[in-house]
Amino acid sequence: QTQNAHLEFVEVLNVKEQVVAGMMYYITLVATDDGYKKIYKTKIWVKEWENFKEVQEFKQIVYATK
């Protein structure tokens, strides 16, 4: 079974940026999974000049209600 296969984006709660070899974005967001709202944290590394984007981390941090 594929994890996170049924996620649907709801909203962004928070974004932080860090300058690295490019930019690292730390995003907290809400998504629904089979109708249940859950909160996730993701870390995305971006190097614009190389057209490079990579998800470094994506994990659920809070269970929410329907």
Swiss-Prot record:
Motif (Secondary area of contact): 18-22
Similarity annotation: Belongs to the cystatin family. Phytocystatin subfamily.
Source species of the chain: Solanum tuberosum
UniProt xrefs under PANTHER family: CYSTATIN FAMILY MEMBER, MULTICYSTATIN
Keywords per UniProt: Protease inhibitor, Stress response, Thiol protease inhibitor
PROSITE patterns given in the database record: CYSTATIN (PS00287)
InterPro entries from the UniProt entry: Cystatin (IPR027214), Cystatin_dom (IPR000010), Cystatin_sf (IPR046350), Prot_inh_cystat_CS (IPR018073)
Tissues showing expression: In tubers of untreated plants. After ABA treatment or mechanical wounding is mostly accumulated in leaves, to a lesser extent in stems, but not in roots.
GO molecular function: cysteine-type endopeptidase inhibitor activity
Pfam assignment, any one: Cystatin
Name of this protein: Cysteine proteinase inhibitor
Signal peptide residues on this chain, from the entry's feature table: none
Top-level division of the source organism's lineage: Eukaryota
Induction description: By abscisic acid (ABA), jasmonic acid (JA) and wounding.
CDD domains xrefs: CY (cd00042)
